[in-house]
């Protein structure tokens, strides 16, 4: 589900623009991501420690963008909950999430809110944000090699062959 893009517009926008299939696929992936986060927290919380493997497990399946989107929705939906850190609340407010009202005025995003203990969701959010930043900063070796000009790459090879005294 990593390849399904996050659709950030409400259902009405999708309907008006002929993008209902994209909206539904994204919403389905986000709901599955929510469930995967709940499962990962349950499986990786032991001895009062939430292990980083929880984030890695979900990121492998859904990618960081969707995880962070679902977590931002969760924190916004539970803004009243003091167990979320001020830092995570501020971050969640900065993530672009459109209100998605149904025919009765209920925000459909409430169905994407993670239902694990808020303190653990806060910790999972902190770990997920750190993990996402770490992955942003580390370009692959292939990307780094492709971005180097040919002269610099050849220069690096020459230097490696020269014996040092």
Give short role names for the model-derived ranges.
Residues 1-164:
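Gram-negative host-targeted secretion-system effectors, predominantly Type III and Type IV
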